[in-house]
């Protein structure tokens, strides 16, 4: 009986989250990331963040992916439940001190705060496999084409 209660609460939470979710348009997300201070943060430009978010979630704040190890990835940046947030299921370090379900809505400042913490580590954006595979070392100017902003990048990261 307790298991059914957990299922009902989880489904109700997911339904509420879905109502408040958002799939961002590229330039809309670029402006949001710039306002949040990610343009040039730790040497990465908004193009880096857009590229990574595109390959992680398709700019979908409600995207959840499940891993073979039992952990899950949440939100626009696909933050992992074993390390960065608590989903109530996976044993976690919860290094961003947050509930994973808080990453599934249109309000992405908490996602950005956690992503800033991750990128501040020695791995930088390399912590995301998608950034290493699809974004690192590539011309990212296409990600900002048609958006009203200027690229700030660190030449040490993007030679």
Swiss-Prot record:
It holds the Pfam family Lys. Residues 22-150 form the C-type lysozyme domain. One of its GO terms (biological process) is fusion of sperm to egg plasma membrane involved in single fertilization. GO terms for molecular function: lysozyme activity. Its EC number is 3.2.1.17. The keyword Hydrolase applies. It catalyses: Hydrolysis of (1->4)-beta-linkages between N-acetylmuramic acid and N-acetyl-D-glucosamine residues in a peptidoglycan and between N-acetyl-D-glucosamine residues in chitodextrins. The keyword Disulfide bond applies. InterPro entries: Glyco_hydro_22 (IPR001916), Glyco_hydro_22_lys (IPR000974), Lysozyme-like_dom_sf (IPR023346). SUPFAM superfamilies: Lysozyme-like. The active site is at 56. Disulfide bonds join 27-147, 51-135, 85-100, 96-114. It is an enzyme of class 3 (hydrolase). Keywords: Disulfide bond, Glycosidase, Hydrolase, Secreted, Signal. It is found in: Secreted. Belongs to the glycosyl hydrolase 22 family. This is Sperm acrosome-associated protein 5. It comes from Homo sapiens. The gene is SPACA5.
